[in-house]
A protein has these predicted regions:
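Pseudouridine synthases involved in rRNA/tRNA modification
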Residues: 1-33, 65, 80-85, 212-219, ...
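Short aromatic-glycine motifs in intrinsically disordered, low-complexity regions
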Residues: 203-213
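Short histidine-centered loop motifs in beta-beta connectors
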Residues: 44, 229-230, 234-237
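Conserved hydrophobic positions within beta-strands
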Residues: 182, 221-224
Length: 326
């Protein structure tokens, strides 16, 4: 027999929808049959599956371990927190994590763990989630960064947090700021627009000034913080959030990111690689500003969160004399 107590993440849905998540490999006919035979009960009584679940409801499944395991499906291996996460902020609904360079934001295949698996491992170890609760709700990230871009990634710890924070990212309510080091000298703040087209085969984008079929509109704002006569430290506000937007948009203006071999200048990148061991673009999701918002996350209104630059990024800024001074 298996017993489950409905939590806040599971409440509000129909009982049959919940069972469909819990017994993901079972045909609907199976759990309707089990409901009729009272092999599945709700609060100790017979149920039809149409009931709306409430927090604290008791669900019992009078099934063998073998049957439950068969229909619940094999749970993928959770990567425990072998790599300690840099938690910038955490409450009952959300987390903000400072993702390091080299870590995937979301799973790309079955072999390499991503931030999602590390997050799940962290929450399991802290007791915030259980193996049982993961059958029906899995915490996940609300935004993605490229593997070799570091900085703030937001995650939903509860269903409310995941849904509402994802919505804020989707409708561009949040203000997202990056730090990057680019080739060339930039003296003035600028707002730039364009159209981005992605080549799925080579995972590379191009930016054009005029609209073409399949291209998506992009908007970027940047302001210089410091330069040394050769390179410039920028603060970039990502207004839209397209694939490789900052990297391709700045490269299109003649100021590619240092370390970016996909869109940048190999000769200069090789110089930084020899000098500092730099293998990827110097781009960091630095600050997240939350405006006045309504709903369950309204307590976050007006808050601002920052993630410190990685050590190598800081070292290069210091050695190249482009540390921020304003």
């Amino acid at each position: 027999m298996k017993e489950f107590i409905i939590n806040e993440n599971e409440a509000g849905q129909r009982f049959d929808k919940y069972l469909g998540k819990l017994l993901r490999e079972a045909p609907k006919s199976f759990f309707y049959k089990m409901l009729r035979k009272k092999n599945i009960t709700l609060n100790g009584g017979r149920a039809t599956g149409n009931e709306k679940l409430s927090t604290g409801d008791h669900v019992k499944l009078f099934l063998s371990d073998e049957t439950f395991g068969k229909f619940a499906g094999v749970q993928e291996t959770v990567a425990r927190a072998h790599q300690k996460l840099d938690i910038v902020y955490e409450d009952d609904n959300i987390l903000l994590i400072n993702k390091p360079v080299g870590m995937l934001s979301q799973p790309a295949d079955d072999k390499e763990p991503s931030l999602v698996e590390y997050l799940t491992g962290y929450l399991l170890e802290s007791g915030a989630v259980t193996e049982a609760s993961l059958h029906t709700f899995r915490p996940s990230v609300c935004n993605r960064l490229d593997r070799n871009t570091s900085g703030l990634v937001a995650a939903g710890k509860s269903l409310t947090g995941l849904q509402e924070l994802s919505s804020l990212f989707h409708d561009r309510s949040l203000h997202k700021f990056y730090r990057c080091l680019v080739n060339g000298v930039i003296k003035n703040e600028k707002y730039i627009k364009g159209y981005l087209h992605k080549d799925e085969k080579c995972n590379k984008v191009t930016v054009q000034e005029t609209e073409t079929s399949g291209a998506l509109p992009i908007e970027t704002r940047y302001r210089p913080l410091e330069d040394n006569g050769t390179v410039t430290l920028l603060e970039v506000e990502l207004i839209t959030g397209r694939t490789h937007q900052i990297r391709a948009h700045l490269a299109g203006t003649g100021h590619p990111l240092i370390g970016d071999y996909k869109y940048g200048r190999r000769t200069l990148n090789d110089e930084y690689r020899r000098k500092y061991g730099l293998k990827s673009q110097l781009l960091h999701a630095y600050r997240l500003e939350i405006p006045e918002i309504e709903g369950r996350l309204s307590y976050l209104s007006g808050k601002e969160f920052t993630a410190p630059l990685p050590y190598l990024f800081q070292k290069i800024l210091k050695e190249e004399h482009v540390e921020e001074n304003k």
